[in-house]
Amino acid sequence: MAPTPNRTPIVAVVGATASGKTGLSLDLAERLRGEIVNTDAMQVYRGMDIGTAKLPVAERRGIPHHLLDTLTVRDPATVAEFQSWARAEIAEIRGRGRTPVLVGGSALYTRAILDRFEFPGTDEAVRRRLEAELDALGPAALHERLRAVDPEAATRILVENGRRIVRALEVVEITGRPFTASLPTMEYADPRTVQVGVDIDRPTLDARIVARVDAMFAAGFVEEVERLLAEGLAEGRTAGRAIGYREVASYLTGELSLAEARERTVSATRRFSRRQDSWFRKDPRVTWIRYDDPGLVDRAVSVVAATLDG
């Protein structure tokens, strides 16, 4: 069910990975008596900390955070489930008279939470067959199949994202309609919703991504992946396909050198960030503010206030 409309706004901070969303979300939560709701598909997994840039507890400024560390790496997590979890958290936060501040890099998850979005059904037999084909043929082959039946969906889904490719093919098969026909409509489920985007130029973002990946490896990312593999990461239908974790797993099995794993992580993150930016830029409801604007927080607060006055 969609959140019940009330006077409290729903605020979402959006933008590409490494753009500065986390810092702005904390600043807004402090100014708006808010609580953070994670919308990153991978930060829900316990132990996936370094590779997802999950904010340590000590750096959360005492602000309550929701939908972090709720699943094991073996647990699957669908967009429909995430929508249900997040909307429940939003309703509880608003019920306490506080402001939910959503932040995370998963554009589809954010849209599914904020917009009117009813999910098509599932067929476990079809899903299992497609997942077996994914394991046997690889994501590139299934992506080509998707391109043949739903070209628009293929342009929106990364070749590496086998999980979403499988879901798109499943929806096409069981509904007879393009997967894109089931994507969220651009209509908020609750009218008191506002999106603030962190605008950052590509050269600066690319440099930040390199710095972030280097910091991940320096902070013990390889050891994190090694530990999670022992906990079943490779068998995880969702967590097992996370950027960086796949590449390091390939290093640990001897398929890649450490330098290759690092470089592939940088490249995959850059591609992902471009796709994120493209998704969010298509939404005219997002108010974009430069990452280096001295009045970033004040301007964002003003955007929220304007929504309340509207």
Curated annotation (Swiss-Prot):
Protein EC: 2.5.1.75
Record-listed ATP binding positions: G15, A16, T17, A18, S19, G20, K21, T22
Catalysed reaction, written as an equation: adenosine(37) in tRNA + dimethylallyl diphosphate = N(6)-dimethylallyladenosine(37) in tRNA + diphosphate
Single GO BP term: tRNA modification
Protein name, per record: tRNA dimethylallyltransferase
Role played: Catalyzes the transfer of a dimethylallyl group onto the adenine at position 37 in tRNAs that read codons beginning with uridine, leading to the formation of N6-(dimethylallyl)adenosine (i(6)A).
Cofactor(s) this protein requires: Mg(2+)
